């Protein structure tokens, strides 16, 4: 007999993990979360040394809406007997290793996460008025589902396939290549690119013969962490943003890009000091090249390595670069889950690759109103620059659970706005 529950989450990344953590406060809610991996892991390939979060630790799984929930980061510190040393360390942000360990600790304590359960298909049973979730370990019925399968690593069109010497940054710590004596090129001017460049500079994977850092941006730009920029990452801002016309939303997202895609000031200063010490104090050979304003247009195999053809955006110059190892820190892109062919005829799309998402993170679809398809990390175009970030995940999770339960279990009422983002407010 197939088990029937109130809610099934597909994927156990931080966003669905946040929903799972908050759901433990709701005794009458029966929910399950499935993941294809054998255990919890969060971007294991990017857990490189001296790599820090861009958000403060209080923006954890639960604290923004339920600070007494046992899955808070503060409780993690207490349970691991490091609360006082953490405070004494005066860390502005925590390392990715520690935040990953916090997420793993929370996941291992929950009894409604099922690993090695690959979701293969989701259909809707019209007779039962329930979603049918087919997994590698059996079938389940659910009144609501939440898609949290994440985004896919993005590689430029010039990259035809990945190899041992040409790959995405998300695999760096899994591959741990020996870069000793090799010419290295890091492509991508965001935080991941900065983290890889700094570690390569320090010889984390061996002393490289040459290191190049290529970015499309016109400089290695800092993350915009100004106080008023942080207001973009509040529920008040999202409520105003979502009601704007589509072209205005696109314009704002372009303007706000450096609030999420820039490099922390600490990272930039650390890199600059490393370069100063290497070249001005130790007087080492200048085997480092910083190459902004360039796009890699062609990637060709060249002997045991690679030849990169680049185009300069400002002076239209063309350059070539020989490299033994090329690492693309080029981010992630949305991809439609491959488990929805049965449901797709019922779902309203914004375009062929983008769902039409309502304010409450449900998809528009032609099924019964009491059955909801929720999505997380799939609606930046409608919900703002904060959507793919951790900053508002607890608030979003609470909003989803309030909708599932049909009442406000979590108080999400907003204080008077500091900034009047819309006219008439």
From Swiss-Prot:
Major place of localization? cytoplasm
Protein name per its UniProtKB record: L-lysine N6-monooxygenase
Q: Which SUPFAM superfamilies match?
A: FAD/NAD(P)-binding domain (SSF51905)
Task: Give the reaction(s) catalysed.
Answer: L-lysine + NADPH + O2 = N(6)-hydroxy-L-lysine + NADP(+) + H2O
| Protein's job | Flavoprotein monooxygenase required for N-hydroxylation of lysine. Involved in the biosynthesis of the siderophore aerobactin which is a chelator that mediates the high-affinity iron transport systems induced by the organism under iron-stressed conditions.
Gene3D superfamilies found in the cross-reference section: FAD/NAD(P)-binding domain
Give the species. Escherichia coli
Enzyme nomenclature, EC number: 1.14.13.59
Could you tell me the keywords of this UniProt record? Cell membrane, Cytoplasm, FAD, Flavoprotein, Membrane, NADP, Oxidoreductase, Plasmid
- Give one Pfam hit by family name: Lys_Orn_oxgnase
